[in-house]
Curated annotation (Swiss-Prot):
Annotated membrane topology: Multi-pass membrane protein
Protein name per Swiss-Prot or TrEMBL: sn-1 oleoyl-lipid 12-desaturase
Species lineage: Bacteria, Bacillati, Cyanobacteriota, Cyanophyceae, Nostocales
Pfam families, sorted: FA_desaturase (PF00487)
UniProt similarity note: Belongs to the fatty acid desaturase type 2 family.
Transmembrane feature ranges: 41-61, 64-84, 98-118, 196-216, 219-239
GO cellular component, one term: membrane
InterPro entries: FA_desaturase_dom, Fatty_acid_desaturase
Renumbered ranges of motif Histidine box-1: 86-90
Subcellular location: Membrane
The enzyme's E.C. designation: 1.14.19.45
Gene: desA
Length: 350
């Protein structure tokens, strides 16, 4: 860990050079990375539809003892739905905006995720990646903020981190952030209202129909548990993308765009079947250099980044329980200009 910290401090010093601009890094990427391919885009969409269909078929025929496997598969396949919507939100799925909006709404509808709400908030994350008090994805809690909370809220947050409940984090983010159009700029509120109406209408039709035909257990079996499976991956991808003991979050006056997007974004390998079903969302460094890169070109772009900027990249990670244990045990609070602080160090200093 010490060697890694020293290396990463050297990288930070290099990237803090104000002459290094994000657009200079983007210029080194092959033009092919930005080319949209209609066949590849729709093949990915079809793959997700087939895999989700396969998942629901397995849920329908599986004996009770095989349901956990079917739930895991279906939840992961549904994450592919989100990734298709993700490309649509960045306008990298199709050249026509109306196609992106239509496909985005269709694929995020079963997840009850308002498309425009997510798109707008997610774009803010890209503009302010790893910037303290601005990034709205997985943002660390500063000690002074934690100290200002009441005992109940502090206890809830400590329980969340210590019991490693990161996997439900995106459920709270989904519920709190995406349905209240008053939290958006006036110019965006009409789009947000439309997306909220779409998912509310879908739920109003699909949920009663599902319950009427399969009962409450059918609702839990066919929608709720797979939906939680999707949120497991949503939460996991989101936290791992930008969180590690040596990855900095900077105050606005010290924030450096190239530093945040190139070094502050982490490549993590997952089981191959997860990467296929989720359309390489784990190959995340290129996506933070340019959101115009379609998901099917991420690996091509990452190979170029490794070749030209490999010395500036964070060490690659591999998804495992030990990785998630490290993140949730060490990345609990964040001291400005210092780094992450576990609760035990916070309380030891008081």
């Amino acid at each position: 860990m010490t060697t890694s910290i020293i290396k990463n401090q050297e990288i930070k010093n290099k990237l803090s050079n104000p002459e290094l601009r994000l657009k200079d890094i983007i210029k080194t990427l092959p033009k092919e990375c930005f080319q949209q391919n209609r066949r590849k885009a729709w093949t990915q969409a079809l793959l997700s539809v087939v895999m989700v269909g396969l998942g629901y078929w397995s849920l329908a025929i599986a004996p009770w003892f095989l349901l956990p496997i079917a739930w895991i598969f279906t939840g992961t396949a549904l994450t592919g739905f989100f990734v298709i919507g993700h490309d649509c939100g960045h306008r990298s799925f199709a050249k026509r905006r109306w196609v992106n909006d239509l496909v985005g709404h269709i694929f995020m509808m079963p997840l009850i995720y308002p498309f425009h709400s997510w798109r707008i908030k997610h774009n803010h994350h890209h503009k302010h990646t790893n910037k303290l008090d601005e990034d709205n994805a997985w943002h660390p809690i500063r000690p002074e903020v934690f100290a200002s909370w009441g005992k109940t809220r502090q206890s809830a947050f400590k329980l969340f981190m210590r019991q490693r409940l990161w996997w439900v984090g995106s459920v709270g983010h989904w519920a709190v952030v995406h349905f209240d159009w008053r939290k958006f700029k006036v110019k965006d509120q009409a789009d947000v209202k439309l997306s909220v109406a779409v998912v509310v209408l879908f739920a109003a039709v699909a949920f009663p129909t599902l319950i009427a035909t399969t009962g409450i257990w059918g609702f839990v079996k066919f929608w709720f548990v797979p939906w939680l499976g999707y949120h497991f991956w949503m939460s996991t991808f989101t936290i791992v993308h930008h969180t590690y003991p040596d990855v900095p979050f900077e105050a606005e006056n010290k924030w450096h765009e190239a530093m945040a997007q190139l070094f502050g974004t982490i490549h993590c390998d997952y089981p191959k079947w997860v990467e296929v079903l989720c359309h390489d969302i784990n190959v995340h460094v290129p996506h933070h250099l340019s959101t115009a890169i379609p998901s099917y070109n991420l690996r091509l772009a990452y190979s170029s980044i490794q070749e030209n900027w490999g010395d500036y990249l964070h060490d690659e990670l591999r998804f495992s329980w030990s990785l998630m244990k490290l993140i949730t045990d060490e990345c609990q609070l964040y001291q400005t200009d210092v780094g992450y602080q576990p609760f035990k160090d916070y309380y030891a200093g008081r």
